[in-house]
Amino acid sequence: GPNPAINGYVRSNGAAVRVIAGATSGGAALVVRQDAGISKPEDFHGKRIASPQMGNTQDVALRAWLKTHGMKTTDRGGDVQVIPAANPDQLTLFVKKQQKQSGHCLTSSSADGAWAPEPWASRLVHEASGRMFLDERELWPKRQFVTAQLVVRTCFVNQHPDLVKAWLRAHVELTDWINGHLTEAKAILNSQLQKETGRL
C-alpha cells in the first residue's frame, strides 16, 4: 500500500525507493456487524474496530475518518478502540460476540466493525453477515485512491533501467487489455487461481 512506500521513502530521505506505477485503485471499506448498533458515524463511540495493521493504509484511513467525525481512539484518550488484526483474523473477531463470564466481558473477543481491503471487506459481508457502512471511494475525488502501487529500489532502477522500462510497459499494456476485456480476464484469473489453489 501507499503507507509502506511513503515510510520507505521518508526513512531513507528519498533515496531508497521509487514509485513507478499504480497497481490498484479502490477496494477498501468500513464494514460493521449487523448487531453492533451502528447506523451513523457517532454510533462508533465506545466500539471496537479492527484494522489490518497499525500504521497501514486502512489503519490510517480509519483513524483519519474517526478524527474527521470528532472521535478519538483509546490510545489518544478517546473511546473508540482500534484493534490491529490481520485480515484473516478480522473474520474471527467479526463473528465473535463479546462473551460474558462471571458478569464481565472477556477482552479481545470481538470487533464491532473493520476497515478492510478487498477481498476481506466482501468476505466480512458475505461470510460474517456484515453490513457495508462506508465504501472508501466515497471519501476521494472521482472515487479513486491508491491501494497498491509498484515500488522499485532506487539502486535497481539505476542498475537496470531498460528492464524496469520493459516491465512497466508490459504492466501498462496488460492493465489496458484487462480493462478492455473484463469478462475474459476474470475467467483467466479464476481458472489460474483454481489451478494454483485447487479451489473454486
Q: Model-predicted segments: where are they?
A:
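Short, glycine-/small- and polar/acidic-enriched structural segments
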Residues: 1-85, 91, 99-118, 133, ...
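Pocket-lining segment of extracytoplasmic ligand-binding domains
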Residues: 2-4, 36, 89-194
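Acidic/histidine-enriched active-site and ligand-binding environments that engage anionic O-linkages
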Residues: 194-200
